[in-house]
């Protein structure tokens, strides 16, 4: 085991604070509409230029072990805020730096760090409650577009695209971001349920121009096993043929004689059918088949439920207005399922989302909700160069997270104003002793810091602006983009409540841990072994002069 360096008290804290400051100073220059860019070196290819706080934070790794500990703790603030709320990483970093910096002064003067932390926690809890009171719901397209634009570093075109996508697929719909093929941003919307399985044979195609099979008003047969024997399918095929409607078969697989017969019937025009594999694997496949059954108003024909293919009736088949089957995707539009059943299924999946432990499971469950409740929208990001594409794509993803957060918990005035207004709830707070009161003061001071940094990045005098905003009421604040004092909500400068709340809570949590640290243990740097000596010199010539 390598030897460790153990550092105590002020020496440990001082080094860690240096690390906090290095990271925070690099991140905070990106804050606000007039924030600056940071250039990140890449080991291959060109450098990345970004204004995204969390991207900058993730790149920072310091040589000094103790400094690096401090930096990594603040990096955790940025990452956690980004994961929970999708934005607010720079605000969280600025808040954490301020709480640590102010708190260290009190710790150095001999105050009890534990009481300081209690005071900080008390103030943050009061501020969060006040933020909830200030918050107003985010419902209109205009408000959603404003949130998206602010989060994408004041790019209104991104905000508009996200608002349009949400309008088309609903608040629960899946919105994904992909690289575009042109210079302009594009929005593709898939209405209905889409899953990533295509036709099992190209002979099913009936629209050669688009290379898809289109079924109008079809029945949908759902089966959880392989189908290889045509005898199993015959009874249900005869019933569908009598009804004179097309049929989509979704099964674990359709092969051999069964597939060949379906293809022949299709080519001869006897019965229009398409066969596709069921989406997903294992338990997820069963769940997705059940989702499709509920969406189309049918049943999954499975032995577990006592149903068999030979005895299947039309009543057990699902129905839809239209189904499109491509090479890789199947889209079910306007399924005949009961709205009540679909809502109940969505509610059930939501409960599973809350109980899910892994991010992957949560993401897959969220996709299922979206497919049942809304639809799927794809924002294709356009840019001139790959460097610009990466940077823009990251901003679109941030903005998307922020708009989801706004729809979830509402919005507050942006530009650091909400935190200034929330200070009113803390101003009258008192702790049990002087040390707790000092903790409350630390948070009071820290809540000015985001506004100060926005103003500083805009090249103005921070103290004057903070005093002017604090003297105002409600949504009155400073719009750094124009340099004017305005009603922030009317001007479209808004933040999701969840983002501001999460930033404050995470910053206080990590800053509190740093203040109450009294020892740090780090690995000693390995000393490089000296280079081995060179080879001894060659021996003299052996020749003898005659």
UniProtKB/Swiss-Prot annotation:
Entry-linked Gene3D superfamilies: GroEL, GroEL-like equatorial domain, TCP-1-like chaperonin intermediate domain
Reaction it catalyzes: ATP + H2O + a folded polypeptide = ADP + phosphate + an unfolded polypeptide
Cross-referenced InterPro entries: Chaperonin_Cpn60_CS, Cpn60/GroEL, Cpn60/GroEL/TCP-1, GroEL-like_apical_dom_sf, GROEL-like_equatorial_sf, TCP-1-like_intermed_sf
GO molecular function: ATP binding; ATP-dependent protein folding chaperone; isomerase activity; unfolded protein binding
Record-level GO cellular component terms: cytoplasm
Location of the protein in the cell: Cytoplasm
Residues that coordinate or bind ATP: 30-33, 51, 87-91, 415, 479-481, 495
BP GO annotations: protein refolding
Main localization of the protein described in the UniProt heading: cytoplasm
Compositional bias (Gly residues): 534-546
Transmembrane segments: none
Top EC class of this enzyme: isomerase
Keywords, ordered alphabetically: ATP-binding, Chaperone, Cytoplasm, Isomerase, Nucleotide-binding
Similarity annotation: Belongs to the chaperonin (HSP60) family.
Function: Together with its co-chaperonin GroES, plays an essential role in assisting protein folding. The GroEL-GroES system forms a nano-cage that allows encapsulation of the non-native substrate proteins and provides a physical environment optimized to promote and accelerate protein folding.
Record note on quaternary structure: Forms a cylinder of 14 subunits composed of two heptameric rings stacked back-to-back. Interacts with the co-chaperonin GroES.
Name of the molecule in the record: Chaperonin GroEL 1
